[in-house]
Amino acid sequence: MDLIETINAVVELQHRVRNLSPNTNIYQDGQTTINDYNAIASRCNGKVYNLRDQIAQLSPFQVHMPVIPISTILSTDDHETMSAGIESLFDVLAAAIRTEGSRQNRAVVTKSIEPEVLKAVLDIGIRSQFSENPYANMLQVDTAKMEQQLEPIDDPLASQKINMLAAGGATNNTGGGYHALVGRATGKTGVVTIIQGRPGAVTFNLNMKVPCSGVLSLTLLPAPGVIQLSLGNQPPNNIPVHAECVDVSTVFAEGDIVIRFELAGRVVGNANKLGTLNFPLCDRISITIEPWNANKQNNANANFNNWPAGTAQRQPTVSLFVNIINASSLIDYETHSKYLAGATYLMGTTFSEDSFIASPPNVVWTMSSLLSGAPPQYIHWTRKIACMIAAFSCKI
């Protein structure tokens, strides 16, 4: 979109100006920066644009960008004048975002529709397709002008309940005879308690929101003494089983767990121990775990008598903590990353919802909701707003 590309270019120029140091010799790069600044100043200085202010009223925004004399040494006054001039330009661009963002669109747009915004874009006259915030580049991705960017993400795991109740043979009211799972996963963390009331391994999956790779750690937490099991396929009015558990993590050994990393249903890597692992590109982590077995049962406490028959008084249990330390994936509208925070902050200050004369209904005013949480009829509108704010958030 032309307004986003203009913001990108002004942000890049601001960074170049800030990299200059006053009262020092100016070399070729510095001279080029001053020339680029002066080119915009000569076109925009004194221009007035009627755009939306922070209370959504049409107000005159005047650009104050005096031309800077070219010399071998940049004075402090000239450096401050350049910095203030670019801030004046950002005031106009912020107002342009509020003005253009108030206009609904039903498809991906590449050109500003508001006449005053288009006038400002043409007067500034510089553009750049690339922003340091990958969410600002998503409209370029949608129009096939750019590929998705590979970036660290904050929420590789899909939000899911990990509940299972599988009876086998005889059962009792303390969890005997059941294989059971009770757990949750979201963001970068999954915690699952495995109750093994009879022989056999238990398998469960942690699904990824998007295919990603990175580093994860697996460790055991202290297991609860009593835990209410899910009903599984039983009628909802059944009385749930309260399993009486014994934490057997002290005898948990290498080989009692198998981790398989899967991509599109195909195993692309595996491990058989706890600890920190570098995992390959995958969209699912499948974990098979067996806290207790026949060998361990040979020297078992009396609480585990008749465990092979499924009628033990207490059940072997472990709690597994899965933590994805870091993960990288192609940025998409539904992925969360560090780039959301700064833009969302601006949505509470410079770009509050009240500063838009019209805003998408039934949408929480955050970057995540604008990018992926809007109703279908408003999604292109909300994404336009989000991408413009994301581009603006890169300014110093």
UniProtKB/Swiss-Prot annotation:
One of its GO terms (cellular component) is viral envelope. It comes from the Viruses. GO terms for biological process: fusion of virus membrane with host plasma membrane. InterPro entries: Rotavirus_A/C_VP6. It is found in: Virion. Keywords: Capsid protein, Intermediate capsid protein, Virion. Its main location: virion. GO terms for molecular function: host cell surface receptor binding; structural molecule activity. Homotrimer. Interacts with the inner capsid protein VP2. Interacts with the outer capsid glycoprotein VP7. Belongs to the rotavirus VP6 family. Intermediate capsid protein that self assembles to form an icosahedral capsid with a T=13 symmetry, which consists of 230 trimers of VP6, with channels at each of its five-fold vertices. This capsid constitutes the middle concentric layer of the viral mature particle. The innermost VP2 capsid and the intermediate VP6 capsid remain intact following cell entry to protect the dsRNA from degradation and to prevent unfavorable antiviral responses in the host cell during all the replication cycle of the virus. This is Intermediate capsid protein VP6. It comes from Rotavirus X (isolate RVX/Human/Bangladesh/NADRV-B219/2002/GXP[X]).
